[in-house]
From Swiss-Prot:
The gene is trmA. NCBIfam families: trmA_only (TIGR02143). It is an enzyme of class 2 (transferase). It holds the Pfam family tRNA_U5-meth_tr. One of its GO terms (molecular function) is tRNA binding. Belongs to the class I-like SAM-binding methyltransferase superfamily. RNA M5U methyltransferase family. TrmA subfamily. InterPro entries: MeTrfase_TrmA_AS, MeTrfase_TrmA_CS, SAM-dependent_MTases_sf, TrmA_MeTrfase, U5_MeTrfase_fam. It catalyses: uridine(54) in tRNA + S-adenosyl-L-methionine = 5-methyluridine(54) in tRNA + S-adenosyl-L-homocysteine + H(+); uridine(341) in tmRNA + S-adenosyl-L-methionine = 5-methyluridine(341) in tmRNA + S-adenosyl-L-homocysteine + H(+). Transmembrane segments: none annotated. One of its GO terms (cellular component) is cytosol. GO terms for biological process: tRNA methylation. PANTHER family: TRNA/TMRNA (URACIL-C(5))-METHYLTRANSFERASE (PTHR47790), TRNA_TMRNA (URACIL-C(5))-METHYLTRANSFERASE (PTHR47790:SF2). This is tRNA/tmRNA (uracil-C(5))-methyltransferase. Keywords: Methyltransferase, S-adenosyl-L-methionine, Transferase, tRNA processing.
Length: 361
């Protein structure tokens, strides 16, 4: 482990340990990231000069008001497959004006399974000639390509990749859609999945999951419970979760297209939802003992926190220590922290991913 990586990780450990000390958690479990090639996503501007074009990012000056263009020829934090593809793709784009004209951004979405989706974003309308050139490029480089411009989306192959993780003595396949959120650090994501499954060990009754996304945690957690009800509001994520459940041949998960707030209303009988009836979901048929939550950065709303306090076990994955801290002030009135983890999902940044298991007092 290099000193620069160790220093940034230790700073996060110190910060989290101090911030959460009032909840008297057990010893912090720390899950490190690879030091390089850990990001499965990368986005670059394309900078055009009179006789050249290159990948670029912007560096803000001290006052934050001005930005300097930084040429990017390699990107060590991105997956090796992205780094290998970058010069090959750029050479092909430069050689074909149909593909390079008014191109202003290139996004990469890679997987451990070997699939790659490249999104080319333009400041011009894309025509049939562009589509033919993009098809030839996709075939030559063995990648999927998507072209975007204002009000236009052209898909060459698929607008998604399929990731595959080995976990709990089996393989899990995940559809990851170009425009939807996925965990960017696949190696740390696998560690998070394993930790969540370990936290669920010995759980009884059924599992409720809020904010399930594409079913990232839902699939492996389903092996630990007799029945699982997962909720998610975004339609594209719900469709991806349902595809993932079917592809992985798992038969004990139902997905409800509800927000956390809406689920609380439905569970407490305050409101009926046609979406539940259409999906043939009877919330009252579940006997929940554990709830799993992986909320957005804003954390969990007050009504949902009250709902969580009724569960025997709460497994909470957080991408924002500050909102986790605020939420724990409420949850530790009824529960105690019995597992505490830090996942270095975003090395070399101030961002921290953490996990807690809370059990009823």
């Amino acid at each position: 482990m290099t000193s620069s990586y160790r220093q940034q990780l230790q700073a996060k450990i110190d910060r989290i340990t101090t911030q959460f000390s009032e909840f008297t958690p057990p010893t912090l479990e720390v899950f490190e990231s690879p030091e390089q090639h850990f990001r499965m996503r990368a986005e670059f501007r394309i900078w055009h000069t009179e006789n050249d074009m290159f990948y670029a990012m912007f560096e803000r000056n001290g006052d934050g008001k001005q930005k300097t263009v930084v040429r990017i020829d390699e990107f060590p934090i991105a997956d090796k497959s992205i780094n290998d593809l970058m010069p090959l793709l750029l050479a092909e784009l430069k050689a074909n004006s149909l593909l390079s004209q008014r191109l202003f951004e290139v996004d990469f979405l890679a997987t451990l399974s070997g699939e790659m989706l490249v999104t080319l974003i333009y400041h011009r309308k894309l025509n049939q000639e562009w589509e033919q050139a993009a098809k030839a490029l996709a075939e030559k480089l063995n990648i999927k390509i998507m072209g975007r411009s204002r009000g236009q989306k052209i898909v060459i192959g698929d607008d998604f990749v399929v990731e595959e993780f080995e976990l709990l003595n089996r393989s899990f396949k995940y559809k990851q859609i170009e425009s939807s959120f996925t965990q960017p650090n696949a190696q740390v994501c696998k560690k998070m999945l394993q930790w969540a499954c370990d936290a669920a060990e010995g759980s009884k009754k059924h599992l409720l999951e809020l904010y399930c996304g594409n079913g990232n945690f839902t699939l492996p957690l389903s092996l630990k419970f007799e029945r699982v009800l997962a909720t998610e509001l975004a339609k594209s994520s719900v469709y991806a979760a349902q595809w993932n459940i079917e592809q992985n041949q798992i038969d004990n998960i139902q997905v409800a297209r509800l927000s956390a707030e809406e689920f609380t209303q439905a569970y407490q009988g305050e409101r009926e939802f046609r979406r539940l009836q259409e999906a043939d979901i009877d919330i009252q048929s579940y006997d929940f003992g554990t709830v799993f939550v992986d909320p957005p950065r804003a954390g969990i709303d007050d009504e949902t926190l009250k709902l969580l306090q009724g569960f025997e076990r709460i497994i909470y994955i957080s991408c924002n220590p500050d909102t986790l801290y605020e939420n724990l002030k409420t949850l530790t009135q009824t529960h105690r922290v019995t597992k505490f983890a830090l996942f270095d999902q975003f090395p070399y940044t101030h961002h921290v991913e953490s996990g807690v298991l809370l059990e009823k007092i």
